[in-house]
């Protein structure tokens, strides 16, 4: 019986050394939905034997205007409660943007209180590596240990900084923010480019996605694909996830509805036939390399020794 090796144990290069993260990052911001998302994570972890998606509790899009402090307190309380019952849960938080008045409160009330229970922090609307560095220091002051940063790139200017951001040692993953990216073009990109099909066809959107993926692979970080706003047509969602994975080089993808999680996980899973093919190819290469090494060793042993005549 042939043993199938995992691709991460076979493939070489920067991405092979990247952190291993669940292939789906599920965002939820409303209190009841946040709780249900964490419950679903626990259920699927028990079902599949490992955690296959992260839950990111959303402050940026989840907090009601004027209720940001109350929302941050609720997020911290939920993290504390759920982590007590499920110590292995993978919970993250998306803060408000650096220039938002609620950013400081988010850091103090969430990272400062339950930072030890978070897997990472998502920073939206990052424009430069200097901003990323500033946020990293702010997190350190609030919590201490070095929490990984996931960075959300959402503008044409930020795309130009993708390689510099990916090179930052605290950055673990970069995500692409499609809707704000399209909006930042002031009408130059049509709304159709945000659709399940158009976002894989429009040249400027494709260029941005590829730039982010290339930056991540260059520095061993995880490229996380943007959300697809398709909830009912699972075939269309699965096709989008396969394109993100197989055409664009992304190894992770956002979801914003529970119905999206399983299709994304399935689409990003390598086919068993592909794993067998790669494993067999690499095993053959290793066998040939070992055979060449043995042959070279035998030749060295058989080489005649130099003789000297003593007069």
Model-flagged regions — what are they?
Residues 1-311:
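Expand to "…catalyze enediolate/carbanion chemistry for C-C bond making/breaking, isomerization
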């Amino acid at each position: 019986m042939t043993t199938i090796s995992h691709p991460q144990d076979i493939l070489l290069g920067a991405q092979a050394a990247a952190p291993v993260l669940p292939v789906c990052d599920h965002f939820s911001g409303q209190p009841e939905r946040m709780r249900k998302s964490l419950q679903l994570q626990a259920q699927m972890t028990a079902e599949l034997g490992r955690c296959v998606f992260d839950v990111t509790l959303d402050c940026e899009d989840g907090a009601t205007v004027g209720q940001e402090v109350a929302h941050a307190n609720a997020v911290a309380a939920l993290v504390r409660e759920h982590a007590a019952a499920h110590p292995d849960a993978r919970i993250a938080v998306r803060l408000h943007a650096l220039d938002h008045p609620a950013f400081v409160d988010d850091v103090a009330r969430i990272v400062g209180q339950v930072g030890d229970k978070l897997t990472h922090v998502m920073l939206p609307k990052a424009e430069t590596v200097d901003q990323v560095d500033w946020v990293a220091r702010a997190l350190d002051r609030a919590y201490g240990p070095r929490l990984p940063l996931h960075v959300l790139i959402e503008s044409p200017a930020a795309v130009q900084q993708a390689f510099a951001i990916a090179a930052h040692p605290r950055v673990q993953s970069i995500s692409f923010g499609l809707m704000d990216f399209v909006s930042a073009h002031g009408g130059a990109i049509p709304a159709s480019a945000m659709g399940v099909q158009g976002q894989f066809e429009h040249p400027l959107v494709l260029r941005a996605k590829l730039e982010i993926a290339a930056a991540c692979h260059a520095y061993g970080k995880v490229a996380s694909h943007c959300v697809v706003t398709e909830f009912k047509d699972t075939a269309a969602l699965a096709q989008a996830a396969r394109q993100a994975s197989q055409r664009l080089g992304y190894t992770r993808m956002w979801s914003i509805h529970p119905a999206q999680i399983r299709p994304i996980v399935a689409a990003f899973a390598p086919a068993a036939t592909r794993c067998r093919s790669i494993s067999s190819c690499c095993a053959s290469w290793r066998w040939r390399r070992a055979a060449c090494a043995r042959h070279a060793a035998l030749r060295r042993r058989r080489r005649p020794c130099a003789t000297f005549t003593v007069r």
